[in-house]
Amino acid sequence: VIYQSAERVRGRNYPATNGFFKVCVISHLRPEKDPLRTAMAARRLPSSSRVRVLHIGRPLSDAMARQVRAETARNPRFCWLGELSHARTRQVLANSQLLSVTSRMEGSSNALSEAIASSVPVVASKISGLMGTLGRDYPGYFPVGQTGALTQLLDKIESNPDFYRRLKAHCARLRPLVEPKRERAAWRELLAELE
């Protein structure tokens, strides 16, 4: 297996006791990414929650553009940032407390590798492409499309520092998988086998 690598970007991603608990979503808005699932889950959180969902990505259809504008208007926990440069996206991620990957189907995602490289823990839909990187025993999964389960998971992560540290430690153990030198070595090995 060749894991997509990512350089580390340093940020301040430990939860502040007096600020927002920032949950980053990095996804162009298209149905297979289930892009507004995190925003919908955040709407159901208790009023005391400090969760703010920061969504980076552009809508790929008029219908998705209407949906994201409607979500922005009705959800005070949701901040749609639109399409940002790669460098700016990486900085927003590095300064977030959590990455949420809600895809219905995909291989592993660039954002997942970038989160792991930058020590940002992840909540993820339980699909094979993401499990291939995070492992079967990762405690931050929720069933695909299950808003209630994601709400419960977000609430637990925000309110239980031990659980948050457990996710962070699990992702830290995965960091060697996404080191650029490891990816380069894996490609060299594969290409040598093909010669």
Indicate residue ranges for each PLM-predicted region:
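A charged, aromatic-enriched C-terminal amphipathic alpha-helix characteristic of glycosyltransferases
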Residues: D162-A192
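Conserved acidic donor-binding segment of nucleotide-sugar-dependent glycosyltransferases
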Residues: R136-G148, K156-P161
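Conserved donor-binding/catalytic core segment of Leloir-type glycosyltransferases
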Residues: P15-K33, T38-R43, V53-I56
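Aromatic "clamp/platform" in nucleotide-sugar-dependent glycosyltransferases that forms part
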Residues: R104
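Short, structured helix-loop element that forms part of the nucleotide-activated donor/catalytic region
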Residues: R52-R77, L81, R88
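Short hydrophobic beta-strand element within catalytic cores of glycosyltransferases
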Residues: P121-A124
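Short beta-strand->alpha-helix junction loop in the catalytic core
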Residues: V1-R12
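Short alpha-helical donor nucleotide-sugar binding micro-motif in glycosyltransferases
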Residues: E83-L84, Q91-S96
